[in-house]
Amino acid sequence: MKLNKFKIIFFIIVLVILIVLVGILGFKWSKHHEVETRVLKNQSDNTNYIEKRDKSVKAPKKLKTVVDKKEPMYGQIDKYLKETHFNGTVAVFDNGKLKMNKGYGYKDIEKGKKNTANTMFLIGSSQKFTTGLMLKQLELEHKLYLNEPVKKYLQWFKTDKEITIKDLMLHKSGLYKYEASTNIKNLDQAVLSIQKRGIDDEIYHKHSYNDANYLVLAKVIEKVTGKPYVQNYYNRLGNKFHLKHSAFYDEKPLQNEMAKGYKFKNNSFSFLRPNVLDQYFGAGNLYMAPYDMGKLIHILQQDKIFSSNVTNPMLHEFGTEEYPEEYRYGFYVTPYLNRVNGVFFGQTFTAYFNDRYIAILGTNIKNTNGFVPNEDKMKHIFYNILNQKKPYNTPGVKVHDKHHINQ
């Protein structure tokens, strides 16, 4: 009799445990299913925000073509770009003053529309620079912490090995390379696909450049602020610093200034249709005039985004405990200059800068064999014409203020 009672009690306990486990697993599955159901909706918060914004935004006042005739170097840049058949727009600032802003060739070859100072280029990975600035803002506001795991902010973003916010920022997450698809319709769907693919053990905690990292960061920014990425961009950078010649790919008021990207093959130009931009918030769907990028960089240099004790190490240190590598927050700090760069759908957008000069080239023709690549044009302009050959940043040296730079 006692044995039967024991069996009954044991059976009841096991049954209760099973019911609890099933309940827990069911809850977790329902939460994950809820995430999947939500992200599978094609309409996103970013799209909704842009549609509302379109109703109140007007095209900005036109920028004028500028070539400073008082200093011969700008005429030399103009001559060089013509000789190398440059198709795009150049902007150069000297100590924050605009010295050159001029378009060359065509932004829309089929319709014969020329590039001007106002042309906005698809900046590709240069957008990671703006994502990085917003990430740093949230870090300083104590809304996120670099050394904490991503799953603290995106509870459903589970991986076999722990990934921190810093891993994403430095491209050391080990996540598989992002594979864009026309079946993916928004940022949420992109990040879910990244989570499902998981980690490549061979590159875990090794630098491996990957759009996936900044797409996930964009989602983290949305999560901790409770606002769409686009709204964060405008609140924190675009509207705040009057970047009027920049816009996301689907903003209607500035469509007329957005360049079309091309490749040149068999003596003809082919349009490269950017058909996956709806999933690239944070990592490649922003259009920008070179003027606006120069303006943003100068604003950063003037400590108008962060205090000097944050800005100076960010812009000058590498090989230190805080900044062990050249790459951080979407841009590079190197011995001779700082660099922002992006390449996407035939368009290349590159900025070189130091404490005196900021030079930006945006082009909408893919690098072609037999022509001077965009990066080589940048090097010639910065090193040879502007004569910026002196070391700028010193490895392993901590920087507190501008007085310590190169000392």
Residue map of PLM features:
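Catalytic loop of the DD-peptidase/beta-lactamase superfamily, centered on the K-T-G motif
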Residues: 2-94, 98, 276-407
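Short active-site loop at a secondary-structure junction
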Residues: 84-89, 111-167, 201-209, 281-284, ...
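Alpha-helical scaffold elements that line and support the substrate/ligand-binding pocket
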Residues: 90-92, 96, 122-143, 168, ...
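Amphipathic coiled-coil signal-relay and dimerization helices
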Residues: 98-104
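A generic structural motif
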Residues: 105-107, 364-365
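The feature captures the short pre-catalytic strand/loop hairpin that immediately precedes
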Residues: 110, 189-200, 265-278
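Active-site helix/loop module of the DD-peptidase/beta-lactamase fold
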Residues: 122-125, 138-175, 224-261
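Catalytic-site signature segments of enzymes, centered on catalytic residues
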Residues: 179-251, 280-284
